[in-house]
């Protein structure tokens, strides 16, 4: 929605939604709703030829059993878009999780994907599907997105985690994490619709160089809350949910040079230290 609002009044906007309940809100925002479902390919016929530029941010469905690694949603979208005239450009919001664990190394877009989790495998499959469109002449740009945060986003800061007293790893066991403010991600999505080479991958990350525990400590200090306990990795398995443990198994530092140089994205919030503060407004680059 942030990217759409940034473009409002500049282009005609159409949003795909599977929920009829969202139609009034989309119309109120000046966006033409198209009710269809990526999980129901037969509903996608009206997508063909409807747009010259496409922003695809739908996550893969969680699938178990046969085909657990496939992203059928992106396959369905790509097939629908090929039914008539292709769009000029498509931007896909992937995840930095496709790199897997890099041992805290600095990661450029040229590093081979090495997904460790089912959701990351599905993102790799989605990237393959949009590259297929690229071979057909669409200017495809893939944004590999880390953790998205924003004080005005539901669950967009560690505040609730701090209130629950969820512990973090001690420094010697901790992992590097990567972040992007929701407003800066929206800016990157918008400019990528027009800028950048085709079949190009971009790390859509800010300039932070920070470990997970230090990020949570920073938030605690900013919000006047107690810093969390530090625990050893051996203790984490007994105290933390599996969803959080999976993020603690991967450490990497994203290099965002290509995004800033080729997309010419100017970050409103270069680090989490500035981004965790109350929001501010600035025009798109």
Language-model segments: which ranges?
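Conserved Rossmann-fold cofactor-binding substructure of NAD(P)-dependent oxidoreductases
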Residues: 27-52
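NAD(P)-cofactor binding segment of oxidoreductase domains
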Residues: 47-91, 128
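Conserved Rossmann-fold NAD(P)-dependent oxidoreductase catalytic core, especially the SDR/UDP-sugar
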Residues: 75-118
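Catalytic helix-loop patch of NAD(P)-dependent Rossmann-fold dehydrogenases
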Residues: 103-142
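NAD(P)-dependent short-chain dehydrogenase/reductase
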Residues: 131-177
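Mid/C-terminal beta-alpha module of Rossmann-like enzyme folds, strongest
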Residues: 186-191, 195-244
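Conserved C-terminal active-site "lid" loop/helix of NAD(P)H-dependent oxidoreductases
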Residues: 237-266
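Amphipathic terminal alpha-helices
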Residues: 270-285
């Amino acid at each position: 929605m942030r990217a759409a609002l940034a473009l409002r009044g500049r282009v005609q906007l159409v949003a795909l939604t599977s929920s009829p309940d969202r139609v009034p809100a989309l119309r109120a925002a000046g966006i033409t709703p198209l009710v269809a479902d990526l999980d129901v390919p037969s509903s996608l016929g009206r997508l063909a030829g409807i747009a010259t530029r496409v922003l695809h941010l739908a996550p893969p469905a969680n699938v178990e059993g046969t085909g657990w690694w496939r992203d059928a949603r992106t396959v369905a979208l790509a097939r629908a878009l090929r039914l008539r005239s292709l769009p000029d450009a498509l931007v896909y919001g992937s995840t930095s999780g496709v790199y897997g664990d890099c041992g805290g190394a600095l990661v450029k877009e040229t590093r081979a994907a090495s997904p460790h989790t089912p959701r990351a495998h599905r993102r790799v499959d989605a990237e393959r599907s949009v590259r297929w469109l690229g071979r057909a002449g669409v200017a495809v740009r893939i944004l590999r997105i880390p953790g998205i945060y924003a004080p005005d986003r539901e669950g967009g800061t560690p505040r609730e985690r701090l209130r629950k007293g969820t512990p973090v790893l001690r420094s010697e066991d901790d992992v590097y994490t990567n972040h992007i403010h929701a407003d800066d991600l929206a800016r990157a999505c918008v400019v990528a619709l027009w800028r950048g080479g085709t079949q190009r991958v971009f790390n859509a990350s800010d300039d932070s160089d920070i470990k997970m525990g230090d990020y949570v400590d920073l938030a605690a200090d900013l919000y006047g809350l107690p810093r969390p306990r530090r625990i050893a990795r051996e203790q984490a398995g007994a105290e933390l949910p599996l969803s959080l443990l999976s993020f603690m198994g991967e450490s990497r530092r994203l290099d965002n040079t290509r995004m800033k140089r080729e997309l010419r994205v100017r970050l409103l919030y270069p680090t989490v230290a500035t981004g965790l503060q109350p929001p501010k407004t600035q025009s798109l680059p």
